[in-house]
Swiss-Prot record:
CDD domains the record matches: SSB_OBF
Keywords: DNA-binding
Name recorded for this polypeptide: Single-stranded DNA-binding protein
GO biological process, one term: DNA replication
Superkingdom: Bacteria
Keyword Ubl conjugation tagged: no
UniProt gene name: ssb
Organism field: Chlamydia pneumoniae
NCBIfam families given in the database record: PRK06293.1, ssb
Keyword Glycosyltransferase set for record: no
Domain SSB: 1-100
GO MF terms, alphabetically ordered: single-stranded DNA binding
GO cellular component: nucleoid
Subunit relationships: Homotetramer.
Amino acid sequence: MMFGHFAGYLGADPEERMTSKGKRVITLRLGVKTRVGMKDETVWCKCNIWHNRYDKMLPYLKKGSGVIVAGDISVESYMSKDGSPQSSLVISVDSLKFSPFGRNEGSRSPSLEDNHQQVGYESVSVGFEGEALDAEAIKDKDMYAGYGQEQQYVCEDVPF
């Protein structure tokens, strides 16, 4: 059995249906962007939500919503309209979250900077030693500094 996490945007509003055995299933079409060489491509996944899971989220799931799903992965084979064999990635959803990078009804979601501007905060990036950094300082900062070096920790450093 394969399990995976996928982040993308809904290509359509959720579809609700009942199986022949009377089980309720909500189907989401999730577009996940991938990069092949220098070209961006979109892989479409069929995400099935079984029973009454995530019912409170359903009114907010619309075409263009950014979501993150996790669940069991399978491949479904079918015949296309022109008669050629096709396959589709199917995810049986165990976890569903709204993406912090999602869009609301075709527009982008408010970002952290937008929220800070609304309440009068100034957005500041903080460096490794707690110093404030501007955009130029961030470019000059070596993100791998200290990688591979042994670190000394005390009990207060460990969160558990």
